[in-house]
Structure formats: structure tokens, C-alpha cells
């Protein structure tokens, strides 16, 4: 029976894991977290999936308490700028498409919608709320989306009943610090020391980690949260890493923390802006913006990328320190080997174009608890865990490649190369089908990876991948109910914009 878990590495991945295991198992499992005091954390301004709400709810944490501690803000979706033409943009929100007479509103927009209004504005409330910089909550704390039940308590991704209408922006280092306080208060043993050697038994399983000051720290299960270096999963156990560089070549990023001159300009969305050799994120925190340029060093040098980033978001601010990051893009073929599970960057990472970093961590932790060993180490459970994690990451990879294949620009060598680069087989089939109709549940990746049908539809239409004609069935149906729903969306948008506070106004009220 598993009695003790040793987590090697802190940061967001380590402390999310420690907190979740304590929330799940309480004192029935001993948890130790070992982290070096000398490791520089990669954490920058972090954007998340809406599913992260389930993580904080599972821990019993109040958003009004933890979010201000972490310089947090709200995220209603992602705004994609300049992926087609300069000045053009669209939103990829968390809001699901409404359905009328068996067809979603995107199908109806293609058939009878007013093309003078963009797809995202016509079909989503979120588009106009983002434009107006509105918070997703009233000043009394009530949620604008009445169909979402906030009383679910300890629910997981698998139990979610409705898409939660927002996610968060936050300072990843502050979240790690906050969760460390939570975990330590609940009995997690915290060891600040350098791991000098990893011990293995005669089977090759990890027996303990040997530290500089605290000697050997033994355990039954070891969780590798050591980042891209993969101290346990790769360096010790020899896990094979599968690179995605053939389809996702971006391998570096440079980040800046930029003070925001006007507080009221705080936006409730992440921005992904196409650049000459990649794209730039803008993540609004409470008092500043996090900006970063994700690029391929095949097309631009780190120095050139930093200059392009500075000239775009902080001209004349040479005093702002740049953080250069080298990224390992891909996944381990197995993220659970013997008695070691990799979580976070040590397991898998893709460029943060759709804010999947925290989502990967959360999904890995939840699946670890669901597949937790009992009296014996069941190889069927371990295999099932590895299969689920691989399918999740591969599904996200496919979705990200869509962004580049669909982008309507070829103005630099980088973007020209994106058109000719290889793509996953599954994506090729989806793009073939997209020429005749919008994708549906049967054509989306069959395993859960976080991106549902509406996400694929939104990216296709936003990037200009439009079917040659609407669904023929709609030409034989009464369009009146759909036209009434378009009008209802417009009216509800007007009412919400009038009623909701600005993003900054609401967040200032809970500081």
C-alpha cells in the first residue's frame, strides 16, 4: 500500500500536486516536497483554462481571497490579432455555442447570418463583453452566466456539468507561494535542499533522493516536477522524449513585465498577436501586463526577438529586464514509469498559444488520483494513465498546428514555412472535412483534451477556414427561430454591458 509520496521540484507544478494530494487523501498519505533554493522558476504571467476553477474549488479556496494575493485577473477568452490581415482579430471564448433546432449558431450564421457582423460577435456574448472590458461578475459577486451552478464544490474535469464562463490570469510565482502555504499548513513536509543523487533498487525503481543537507529522502511514489530537465523521468529512468519540432518549431520565448499606465485598460482576455517569426502573448495582471514573444530561432535570433518585443510593447523602456526561455516542445512517451510520475514541464509542454500549461498539470494530477496505486502497482492502471495523458497532449498539438495552417499570412519566411510544414494525420483529415461542413463531435479527436467542438469551429471560422456552402438541411428549415436567437444574443449583450462592472472595477473591489 502506498504510504508516502515524494515530490521533487516546487513551482506551480510541485505545489499544485502537493495541495491536490493533500486535499484528496488528507493524512492517509504522507507528502514531502523537495525543492532547491537555487532553481530559477520559469513562471511568468500565466493564463489558464476555465477548468482551473475546479482545481481551486476542490481545495476549498475562495476566489475572492486567493486571486488578489496572486495579482490575478479574469480571462473570458483569447483574442487573436493579425493572424490573417493586419488589424483583423477574433475571439476564442470559453462560452459554448447555443443550439437552435439541432444546429449550433455557427451553422445558422453561415446559412442566414448577417455577414457584416463577424462570426464571433454574432454567435457569442463574450465577444462584446471583451470589447467593453467587462468582468464576469456583478459587484455583489454574482456570476453573469446563470446556467452555471457554482455550488458543485469538489468537482473534477470529468464531472463538470457546464463550461465555466471564465478563467484567470495570475502571477505563477505568487500562485506557487500561496499553494505552498496551503499545503504546508495541511501537513506537507517541505525540504529546501539540492538533490545530488537519485537512488534506485535492483528493479530500477526509485528508492530515494539523496540531498546535500538532509540525506536520503525515501518514499513509495515519486513525482517529477523538475521542469524541462526531467531529473527523475528522463535522467534517472531514461524515459524517451518525443519532440514536436517537426510540426511546432517554436522553441524559445522572451518575456517582459510591463507596467500598465491606465488601470481601467485592464482587459478580461489574453491576446495572441502574430509577429514576424512567431506570436506574442499579452496577459493582463492586476497592475501590469505580462508580455512574451514565442518564436523559432531558425528564423530570428534571441537578440532580434527581444528588440521586436520591446519595440512593440515597451518602446524606450530599456530598464525592463527581459527573461529568455528555451523550451522543450513535446511529451514523454510515458509520463508514468515504474514508481515515478512526471507532472508539468517534465512530462509535456507545448507553446502556450491556448494556455494549456496549467491545464496539463491539473489533468495529470486528477488522473494520478484516479489511477492511484493500491496494494500493488497495477500495470493496467499505469498503462491507462499513460494512454490518457498521451492522447490529451497529442490532441492539443493537433489543435495548435491548426492555428498555423489556417493563418492567412505569408509575409515572412516564418509564415511561408508554416504553410509547407508537416501536419498530424488527424488534422489533415479535419481540414479536408472542413471544406464541406463545420466540424462536429464525430470528427473531433476522440479522447478528452480540453478543446471541444465549438473551439475547433471558432478557430476555423476565425482564421477563414469556411465551408464552401452551409449545411443543405438548413435551406429547408424555418430560419425564424435562429434569427430570433441572434437578436436575443445582441439584446443580452446590451443588458450585460450595462449591468456588469469593468474588469478593473470589480477586481479593485476585492483587493
UniProtKB/Swiss-Prot annotation:
The record ties this protein, via InterPro entries, to: FAD/NAD-bd_sf, Flavin-dep_Halogenase_NPB, Flavin_halogenase, Trp_halogen
Sites binding chloride sit at 356-357
Q: In which pathway does it act?
A: Antibiotic biosynthesis
For this UniProt record, the keywords arranged alphabetically read as follows: Antibiotic biosynthesis, FAD, Flavoprotein, Nucleotide-binding, Oxidoreductase
Instruction: Using the UniProt record, name the top-level EC class of this enzyme in a single word.
Output: oxidoreductase
Residues reported to bind FAD:
10, 13, 36, 39, 42, 44, 47, 195, 345, 358
What reactions does this protein catalyze?
L-tryptophan + FADH2 + chloride + O2 = 5-chloro-L-tryptophan + FAD + 2 H2O
Which is a GO BP term held by this UniProt record? antibiotic biosynthetic process
Could you cite one Gene Ontology molecular function of this protein?
A: monooxygenase activity
Q: What happens when the gene is disrupted?
A: Mutant cannot produce pyrroindomycin B, but still produces pyrroindomycin A, the nonhalogenated derivative.
Q: Where is the active site?
A: 75
Listed EC numbers: 1.14.19.58
List residue numbers at the site (Important for activity): 354
Positions bound to L-tryptophan = 50, 93, 160, 163, 450, 454
What this chain does, per the entry, is described as: Involved in the biosynthesis of the antibiotic compound pyrroindomycin B. Catalyzes the chlorination of tryptophan (Trp) at C5 position to yield 5-chloro-L-tryptophan. It is also able to use bromide ions to generate monobrominated Trp, but the brominating activity is only about 75% of the chlorinating activity.
Annotated family: Belongs to the flavin-dependent halogenase family. Bacterial tryptophan halogenase subfamily.
According to the record's subunit comment, the protein's assembly and interactions are:
Homodimer.
Query: Entry's PANTHER family?
Result: FAD-BINDING PROTEIN, FLAVIN-DEPENDENT TRYPTOPHAN HALOGENASE
In the UniProt entry, what is the domain comment? The tryptophan-binding module binds the substrate in such a way as to expose the C5 position to the key lysine and glutamate residues at the site of chlorination.
Descriptive protein name: Tryptophan 5-halogenase PyrH
Q: What is the lineage of its organism?
A: Bacteria, Bacillati, Actinomycetota, Actinomycetes, Kitasatosporales
UniProt gene name: pyrH
Amino acid at each position: 500500500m502506498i504510504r508516502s509520496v515524494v515530490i521533487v521540484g516546487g513551482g506551480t507544478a510541485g505545489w499544485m500536486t502537493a495541495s491536490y494530494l493533500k486535499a484528496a487523501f488528507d493524512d492517509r498519505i504522507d507528502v514531502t516536497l523537495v525543492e532547491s533554493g537555487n532553481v530559477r522558476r520559469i513562471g511568468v504571467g500565466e493564463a489558464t483554462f476555465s477548468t482551473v476553477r475546479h482545481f481551486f474549488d476542490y481545495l476549498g479556496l475562495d476566489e475572492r481571497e486567493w486571486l488578489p494575493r496572486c495579482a490575478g485577473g479574469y480571462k473570458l477568452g483569447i483574442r487573436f490579432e493579425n493572424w490573417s490581415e493586419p488589424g483583423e482579430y477574433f475571439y476564442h471564448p470559453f462560452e459554448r455555442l447555443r443550439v437552435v433546432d439541432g444546429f449550433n449558431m455557427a451553422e445558422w450564421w453561415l446559412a442566414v447570418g448577417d455577414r457584416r457582423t463577424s462570426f464571433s460577435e454574432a454567435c457569442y456574448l463574450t465577444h462584446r463583453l471583451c470589447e467593453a472590458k467587462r468582468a464576469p461578475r456583478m459587484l455583489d459577486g454574482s456570476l453573469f452566466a446563470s446556467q452555471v451552478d457554482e455550488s458543485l464544490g469538489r468537482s473534477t474535469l470529468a464531472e463538470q456539468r457546464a463550461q465555466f464562463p471564465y478563467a484567470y490570469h495570475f502571477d505563477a510565482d505568487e500562485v506557487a507561494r500561496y499553494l505552498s502555504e496551503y499545503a504546508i499548513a495541511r501537513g506537507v513536509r517541505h525540504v529546501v535542499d539540492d538533490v545530488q543523487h537519485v537512488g534506485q533498487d535492483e528493479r530500477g525503481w526509485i528508492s530515494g533522493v539523496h540531498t546535500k543537507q538532509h540525506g536520503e529522502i525515501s518514499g513509495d511514489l515519486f513525482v517529477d516536477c523538475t521542469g524541462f530537465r526531467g531529473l527523475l523521468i528522463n535522467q534517472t529512468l531514461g524515459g524517451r522524449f518525443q519532440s514536436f519540432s517537426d510540426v511546432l518549431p517554436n522553441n524559445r520565448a522572451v518575456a517582459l513585465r510591463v507596467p500598465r499606465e491606465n488601470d481601467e485598460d485592464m482587459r478580461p482576455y489574453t491576446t495572441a498577436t502574430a509577429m514576424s517569426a512567431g506570436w506574442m502573448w499579452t496577459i493582463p495582471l492586476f497592475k501590469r501586463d505580462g508580455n512574451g514573444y514565442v518564436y523559432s530561432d531558425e528564423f530570428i535570433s534571441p537578440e532580434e526577438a527581444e528588440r521586436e518585443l520591446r519595440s512593440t510593447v515597451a518602446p524606450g523602456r530599456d530598464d525592463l529586464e527581459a527573461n529568455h526561455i528555451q523550451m522543450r516542445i513535446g511529451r514523454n512517451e510515458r509520463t508514468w514509469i515504474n514508481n515515478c510520475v512526471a507532472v508539468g514541464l517534465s512530462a509535456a509542454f507545448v507553446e502556450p498559444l491556448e494556455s494549456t500549461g496549467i491545464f496539463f498539470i491539473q489533468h495529470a494530477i486528477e488522473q494520478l488520483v484516479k489511477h492511484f496505486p493500491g496494494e500493488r502497482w497495477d500495470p493496467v492502471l499505469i498503462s491507462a494513465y499513460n494512454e490518457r495523458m498521451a492522447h490529451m497532449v497529442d490532441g492539443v498539438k493537433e489543435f495548435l498546428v491548426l492555428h498555423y495552417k489556417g493563418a492567412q499570412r505569408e509575409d515572412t519566411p516564418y509564415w511561408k514555412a508554416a504553410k509547407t510544414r508537416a501536419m498530424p494525420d488527424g488534422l489533415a483529415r479535419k481540414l479536408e472535412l472542413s471544406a464541406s461542413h463545420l466540424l462536429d463531435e464525430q470528427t473531433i479527436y476522440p479522447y478528452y483534451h480540453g478543446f471541444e467542438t465549438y473551439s475547433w469551429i471558432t478557430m476555423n471560422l476565425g482564421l477563414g477556414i469556411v465551408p464552401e456552402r452551409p449545411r443543405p438541411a438548413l435551406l429547408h428549415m424555418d430560419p425564424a427561430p435562429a434569427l430570433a436567437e441572434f437578436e436575443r444574443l445582441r439584446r443580452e449583450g446590451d443588458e450585460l454591458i450595462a449591468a456588469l462592472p469593468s474588469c478593473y472595477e470589480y477586481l479593485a473591489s476585492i483587493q
